[in-house]
Amino acid sequence: MAVKVGINGFGRIGKCVVRAAINNPDVEVVAINATGDNEGTALLLKYDSVHGTIPNEVTFDDDNIYVDGKKIRVFHDRDASKLPWSEEGVEIVMECTGKYRDAEEAKVHLNQPTVKKVLISAPGKNEDLTMVMGVNQDMYDPAKHHIISNASCTTNCLAPFAKVLCDEFGIKRGMMTTIHSYTNDQKILDARHKDPRRARAAAMSIIPTTTGAAKAVAKVLPQLKGKLDGFALRVPTPDVSATDLVCELEKPATKEEINEAFRKAAAGE
């Protein structure tokens, strides 16, 4: 039986989660919380300039949107404590607003009787566990881990190959650079921003800025705590990012040995 999911926040991540869930028989999105009107929410789900148009029929009424006739209830409340997830039987809340990243705030979803878990789609604070699939999912204990961070996109990129190097050769220290597509946090044209570098036009600039991914990776690979640092280059592309890691290994390794280690990891050996 499919798990019933509610999504708080219908930005880039929230929308992608719904799109992915449409064709997943194990997941049923039954409710979302979006700040805009239902017509706009339906249009944003149907059409995407980066990922294309979904083939499904998307319609709406005053209280819901429908995907191929299947109802998804839509709430409109900026206060997460007022969201009636249990009315739709929500079991897992995907926290995708970027606002409730601290578990002390995200736990408000657990006040609803049917909600069992909260998954934060960003780096968390005070969370029960930060989990990157393929790296540390074995650490998950359903009896005690109820508020879980999925980390950042860059951490999800960095952690898998850092794990291979760490397991096979050991890492003494390293420096990471992420070449990162622009995001909605940046400006289309020059405008004020708390980070003056991000105030420059996103589609016209290569913008050096900070990233917490190198340090956050220690949440999923504790043996790397204090060993990695890094920064980001925001580049004028709408999608796809790359991560470059330069590191000193604890034991010698040839190019062939490193490539073979990655080949085996990719094959699940």
What are these regions (language model features)?
Residues M1-A199:
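N-terminal Rossmann-like NAD(P) cofactor-binding subdomain of oxidoreductases
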Residues E168, G174-T177, D185-E269:
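C-terminal substrate-binding/catalytic lobe of Rossmann-fold NAD(P)-dependent dehydrogenases
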